Amino acid sequence: MEKELSLELCNAIAEAIIAKKELHGGSIDAYAKSLGISASIFSRLKKGERTNLIKPDKWLAIGRKLGVQIGTTTWRPVETDVYLEMQDDFSYCQQNAKALLLVDDCGIGKTYCARILIAKMHNAFYVDASQAKSKRLFIQALAREVGISTNATLAETLEDLRYYINALGGCFICIDEAGDLDYQAFLELKALINGTIGRCGWYMMGADGLRAKIQSGIKHRKVGYREIFDRFAARFRSITPDTKEERQAFYKKLFTDVAYQNLDDKNQLNAVIAKCYTKIDGQKTIPTDRSLRYLETLIKVAQQQNSNQ
């Protein structure tokens, strides 16, 4: 039996669909395809139709893609230092058709910030490479994101994709978890960048695995890695500081900024942040894995305990 969604949720997702079109410079058909619906369904949504128009699973998939919140979640997005740095990076890349490479710690909110920023940008697209590791899957994922049909051959889809990006102009494409791309996918990414010079900004994000993959490829003179590193300014950009003292200050501010905006009881602030620290040899140090995810869990537990009192 198919699940039923509330009219309230469908309305929220439909409103997000209509609003996002204003930021998509392509045709209605291309925009609709990027969401997995037809242009006629988009038109009917604009006219107010909801019932039996889209299957529940598709509603949910679109809602997730567009960042529509489900239920009564009170989690508040925060413009952290990570958010502000990435905002500057994204703007620079899009306005100047340049490419940058961000390699940083896990759990500082890179993906979360990227999704929020891209949702606000014109002609900006996001691909999670961990879900599209191979050459075929990567090209198809990017094609679907920008609104290109994937029914043609892979070579034709790639040509259509390159043509469409150039035709739109001023595009921005963020490749998250880029270290998961296999070798052939990396080569196609390089070809796409070469074929859209001056027409599209690119941004690759990942953690240590991405750095290791590129460095290893360059060291062993594997075709393409030196070229793609050069396209991305020949530099591994990082937001998290290198020195111990600066890192601790960075993480403390990151935790505090997020916790302050999301904790209702500010008296719990210091206690919650303190739990994000681990002790090694009797000294406090900050974990570098799942930091903000752990903080989010602590905050939600604290909120639940308060509501039960």
Segments the model singles out, each with a brief description of its role:
Residues 77-95:
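Pre-Walker A adenine-sensing motif
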Residues 121-131:
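Conserved catalytic segments around the Walker B and adjacent sensor/switch elements
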Residues 67-81:
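Short C-terminal boundary/hinge segments that cap the last helix of small helical domains
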Residues 95-116, 130-131:
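Walker A/P-loop nucleotide-binding motif
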Residues 134-135, 140, 149-190, 194-201, ...:
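Mid-core helix/loop region of P-loop NTP-binding domains shared across ATPases and GTPases
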Residues 101-106, 195-224:
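Sensor-1/coupling segment of RecA-like P-loop NTPase cores
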Residues 122-124, 217-240:
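A short helix-turn-beta junction within AAA+ P-loop NTPase domains corresponding to the substrate/partner-engaging
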Residues 1-30, 34-68, 235, 240-309:
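C-terminal alpha-helical "lid" subdomain
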